[in-house]
């Protein structure tokens, strides 16, 4: 990220600390991404399909939601896409992928399938505001998508995706 910005990586680390802290500072939201990711480390893998959307929808529906929406719109309209991709690759895929890497070598694609579903939910519900989806209670969305998320995380993968 530092290279893309044309600055010394040591300075970025000095002023912002971790990549998570840099991401939080860059999007100007008073939430540390690790506050969202850390509880997922404690959750049993068999419950992540429910835990992930529950946590993310609660965040988006909180008082921080409008700022998150504005930030996402801004990031998607410029060079921020690379930054968001880097965050997902370094944080979400690495954190989640290492927990669901069975058979070995599938953790990354499993985490990316989950991320694609959750990004789609956020886009449809908060950015594009597709009705009636945008107005559904969060719990209904969680109950509907959790089985698919869990299948991505722990289910059998189609031929060609597993090594």
Name each model feature, range by range.
Residues 60, 64, 76-80, 92, ...:
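Short alpha-helix boundary/capping elements
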Residues 35-72:
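Hydrophobic alpha-helical connector segments
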Residues 81-86, 99-152, 156-163:
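Hydrophobic/aromatic-rich alpha-helical bundle segments in the mid-to-C-terminal region
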Residues 56, 68-75, 114-118, 122:
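Short alpha-helical scaffolding segments that buttress acidic/His motifs in well-ordered protein cores
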Residues 16, 73-78:
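Short helix-capping/turn signature of helix-turn-helix
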Residues 28-33:
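Short, basic, alpha-helical segments at the C-terminal edge of helix-turn-helix-like DNA-binding modules
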Residues 1-21, 25:
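Helix-turn-helix
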């Amino acid at each position: 990220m530092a290279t893309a910005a044309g600055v010394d990586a040591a300075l970025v680390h000095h002023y912002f600390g971790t990549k998570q802290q840099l991401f939080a500072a860059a999007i100007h939201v008073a939430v540390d991404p690790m506050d969202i990711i850390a509880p997922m480390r404690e959750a049993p893998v068999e419950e992540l399909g429910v835990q992930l959307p529950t946590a993310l929808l609660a965040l988006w529906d909180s008082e921080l939601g409008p700022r998150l929406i504005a930030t996402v719109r801004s990031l998607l309209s410029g060079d921020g896409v690379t930054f968001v991709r880097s965050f997902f690759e370094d944080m979400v895929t690495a954190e989640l992928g290492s927990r669901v890497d069975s058979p070995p070598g599938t953790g990354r694609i499993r985490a990316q399938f989950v991320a694609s579903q959750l990004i789609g939910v956020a886009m449809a519900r908060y950015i594009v505001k597709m009705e009636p989806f945008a107005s559904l209670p969060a719990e209904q969305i969680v109950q509907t998508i959790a089985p698919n998320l869990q299948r991505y995380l722990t289910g059998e993968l189609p031929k060609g995706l597993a090594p």
